[in-house]
Amino acid sequence: MAKKAKGNRVQVILECTEHKESGMPGMSRYITTKNRKNTTQRLELMKYNPVLKKMTLHKEIK
């Protein structure tokens, strides 16, 4: 039997960088998908952080 190929689209978690440094309780995380072939580097997106009430940089975590 042939093996099932892994898909190119994978699920990734984005975590706020400013919130981690601020020391406030809680965390801001988003789950999204990316195409493994087109985007080989880690994602960095500006997303809304409801705790800090502003747009902040969210980076992909393992």
Curated annotation (Swiss-Prot):
GO terms for biological process: translation. InterPro entries: Ribosomal_bL33 (IPR001705), Ribosomal_bL33_sf (IPR038584), Ribosomal_zn-bd (IPR011332). It comes from the Bacteria. It holds the Pfam family Ribosomal_L33. GO terms for cellular component: cytoplasm; ribonucleoprotein complex; ribosome. The keyword Ribonucleoprotein applies. GO terms for molecular function: structural constituent of ribosome. Keywords: Ribonucleoprotein, Ribosomal protein. SUPFAM superfamilies: Zn-binding ribosomal proteins. The keyword Ribosomal protein applies. Belongs to the bacterial ribosomal protein bL33 family. This is Large ribosomal subunit protein bL33. The gene is rpmG.
